[in-house]
């Protein structure tokens, strides 16, 4: 037994200078752990609700109410429970909140407690977090989906697509994939400089040049890959996070690259891109409630490319179940703060994998030095992780943790590589 004895919380800052919640847990055997909660810039309508203070302090974004929720309600609800009984702990958290969207105590308060308990239990068990959560077979290192060019809500430019990513699919190890990604990142900076484009950074460490559109951005990245001596499509593939909900409105549809488009027109554009570039993944290509559009797009190109539901599914097993029944998307983006507890996150991943959906573990644009998602990516065998460019310490912290995990696993480690993606699975 490893009984939860004390629970504490504080307000800290995330990578964008906004407040977030950090929770600490002490067990009766002396084991101690803390967890910090991320937050997003582009958030889905169906996400669990963060508790923010409002008012003038921190522009209304303070989290003193969430901290107080941890201290006054969450702590009494979980103190005395065995920390290794994660499902019991998380159910106690859900019962204490009592709302379907976690809006009373706040998903940020609940998640901080949930993750801190898991970390403390791992410490008490003498196991790394990935091993504690994932069991004896956790051994697959994810492909890093590096967001090296930022647009949309992550940058103050005219580029509508939110993230342009590189995926080092041809590497033999995670260590090699990280090096390849970093080399492409630095090569892209030199390409941008040569063309007189800005090299300032967006929220997630990627460059934020004001380029003409999607194809120009993909072309710039393709040139950067070639500049490193790596082979586009074989060594390094491309991926997008469109975040289409950000430019969709009822009545006018998708306002994209200067014109209003229908779901069918957006789908035709994606089909054209997938044929022209080695794109392995497109996240949120359509609005979070455009189920008909998603189903049609999945039928059209789902056998060629990974179609990832982020705002569509919000890591919620009920939303995912609906998507599976309808045949919408073929992959789930996993963000722990969208759903609010570790148990619900693991349930969503399990549901996805049992139904043939791929999963991609993900950070948020407002991150901290917390490395939990690196361990979770290995624990659940997701095969993919999205945690920004190889720049800014809150992003690099996750990559460095994966290096440690790969080293820890030794000969047992396996890098997911190209088989993580439907494009290659369908090609055989």
Swiss-Prot record:
Q: Which NCBIfam families match?
A: eno
What is the superkingdom listed in this entry's lineage?
A: Bacteria
UniProt function note = Catalyzes the reversible conversion of 2-phosphoglycerate (2-PG) into phosphoenolpyruvate (PEP). It is essential for the degradation of carbohydrates via glycolysis.
Q: Which family does it belong to?
A: Belongs to the enolase family.
Against SMART domains, the record matches this protein to: Enolase_C, Enolase_N
Q: Which reaction does it catalyse?
A: (2R)-2-phosphoglycerate = phosphoenolpyruvate + H2O
Keyword annotations from UniProtKB, A to Z: Cytoplasm, Glycolysis, Lyase, Magnesium, Metal-binding, Secreted
- Give the GO terms filed under biological process for this record: glycolytic process
Catalytic residues (positions)? 204, 335
Q: Which Gene3D superfamilies match?
A: Enolase-like C-terminal domain, Enolase-like, N-terminal domain
**Pathway listed:** Carbohydrate degradation; glycolysis; pyruvate from D-glyceraldehyde 3-phosphate: step 4/5
Q: What is its EC number?
A: 4.2.1.11
Cofactor dependency = Mg(2+)
Note the InterPro entries from the entry.
Enolase, Enolase-like_C_sf, Enolase-like_N, Enolase_C, Enolase_CS, Enolase_N
Which top-level enzyme class is recorded in the Swiss-Prot or TrEMBL entry?
lyase
Give the binding site residues for (2R)-2-phosphoglycerate.
162, 335, 364-365, 386
Q: What is this protein called?
A: Enolase
Q: How is the cofactor bound?
A: Binds a second Mg(2+) ion via substrate during catalysis.
């Amino acid at each position: 037994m490893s009984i939860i004895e004390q629970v504490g919380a504080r307000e800290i800052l995330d990578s964008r200078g906004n407040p977030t919640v950090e929770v600490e847990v002490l067990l009766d055997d002396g084991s101690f752990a803390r967890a910090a909660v991320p937050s997003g810039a582009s958030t889905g309508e169906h996400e669990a609700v963060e508790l923010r203070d409002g008012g003038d302090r921190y522009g209304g974004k303070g989290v003193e109410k969430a901290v107080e929720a941890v201290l006054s309600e969450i702590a009494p609800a979980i103190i005395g429970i065995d920390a290794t009984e994660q499902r019991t702990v998380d159910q106690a958290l859900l019962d204490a909140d009592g709302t379907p969207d976690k809006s009373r105590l706040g998903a940020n308060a609940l998640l901080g407690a949930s993750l801190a308990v898991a970390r403390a239990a791992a410490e008490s068990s003498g196991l790394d977090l990935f091993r504690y959560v994932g069991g004896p077979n956790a051994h697959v290192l994810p492909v890093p989906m590096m967001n090296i060019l930022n647009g949309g809500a992550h940058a103050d430019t005219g580029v509508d697509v939110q993230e342009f990513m590189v995926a080092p699919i041809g590497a033999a190890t995670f260590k090699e994939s990280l090096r390849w990604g970093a080399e492409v990142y630095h090569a892209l900076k030199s390409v941008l400089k040569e063309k007189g484009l800005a090299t300032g950074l967006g929220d997630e460490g990627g460059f934020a040049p004001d380029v003409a559109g999607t194809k120009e951005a993909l072309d710039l990245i393709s040139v950067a890959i070639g500049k490193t001596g790596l082979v586009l499509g074989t060594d390094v593939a491309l991926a997008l996070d469109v975040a289409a909900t950000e430019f969709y409105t009822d009545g006018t549809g998708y306002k994209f690259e200067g014109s209003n488009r229908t779901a069918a027109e957006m789908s035709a554009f994606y089909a054209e891109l997938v044929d022209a570039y080695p794109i392995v993944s497109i996240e949120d290509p359509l609005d979070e409630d455009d189920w008909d559009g998603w189903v049609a797009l999945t039928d059209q190109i789902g056998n060629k490319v990974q179609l990832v539901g982020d705002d569509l599914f919000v890591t919620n097993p009920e939303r995912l179940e609906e998507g599976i029944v309808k045949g919408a998307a073929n992959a789930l983006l996993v963000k722990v703060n969208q759903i609010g507890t570790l148990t619900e996150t693991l349930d969503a991943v399990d549901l996805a994998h049992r139904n043939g959906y791929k999963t991609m573990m993900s950070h948020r644009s407002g991150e901290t030095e917390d490395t939990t998602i690196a361990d979770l990516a290995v624990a659940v065998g997701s095969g993919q992780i999205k945690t920004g460019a190889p720049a800014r310490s809150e992003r690099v912290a996750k990559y460095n943790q994966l290096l440690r995990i790969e080293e820890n696993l030794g000969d047992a480690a396996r890098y997911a590589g190209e088989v993580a993606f439907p494009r290659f699975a369908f090609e055989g």
